[in-house]
C-alpha cells in the first residue's frame, strides 16, 4: 500500500509540473484537460495545483471560469492557503473585479486569517482601484503592527497609486520613508514613478526621480524614453520645458527637435 501511495504521489507531481508548464506556454486548454483527468483519480488535486490552475485562468482572462472553480473548491471542501487566496484576490483585481476582491478580503479578515505582505500589497492596490484611498493608506500604515515589512513592490503600489490619484506629495513622503527604512528602490519602481508623474504634468518631480536613476547607475526603460520623446518633442505638450531635462538625457535632443 505504501508503494502505491508513493507511485501516486510521483504521478501527481509529474502532472502538476506538466499543468504548470502548459499554462506558462499558453496552452490553457491542454492544462485544463490534464487537470480534469487528474481530478478523476483516487487522490484529488491539492491546494498547490488548484492555485496553479486558478492563476492560469486569471492570467488568460478567463475570470468567469476562475470564479466558478473557486466556488466549486469551497463546495468540495478544498483547504485554502494564504497563497491561494493571494492568487484569487490578485486575479480578481487585475481582471476588472477589484470590488469583488475587496469584499472577499473583508470576509477573510473577519475570519481572523493572518495575511502575508504579498496579499496585503494586492489588496491595497485593489482598494485604490475602487476608490477606498484612506482605507488603503491605513492598511499600509498598519503593516508594521502586523509584524510584516513592506517590500519594493508594496512601496511601488503605494506611490504609483497615490500619484495616479493626484496625491503626489503623499507619494513623495512614502518614497522618503522607504529610503529611511533601508529599502532601496529598484529600476522598475523609479521608471513607474517617472512615467506616472510625467503623465500628471509633474515635470519637476519627474526630473527629480530621473536624477535618482542617474545616481544609482540605472537606466530608463524604453517605455519611459518613448514617453519623454512624445511629451518633449516639437509637437509635445512640454516642448518648451525640454531644457529642464538632465544632461544625461540630452541624447534625446535629436528626437525631441525632429
What label would you give each PLM region?
Residues 221-258:
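Eukaryotic acidic, Ser/Thr-rich intrinsically disordered low-complexity regions
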Residues 130, 143, 158-163, 174, ...:
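Short, conserved recognition motifs on repeat-domain binding surfaces
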Residues 11-16, 20, 31, 46-51, ...:
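Pentatricopeptide repeat
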Residues 164-167, 182-187, 196-206, 217-222, ...:
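Short amphipathic alpha-helix initiation/capping segments at coil-to-helix junctions
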Residues 2-7, 21, 31-42, 56, ...:
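Hydrophobic packing position at a conserved site in alpha-helical tandem repeat units
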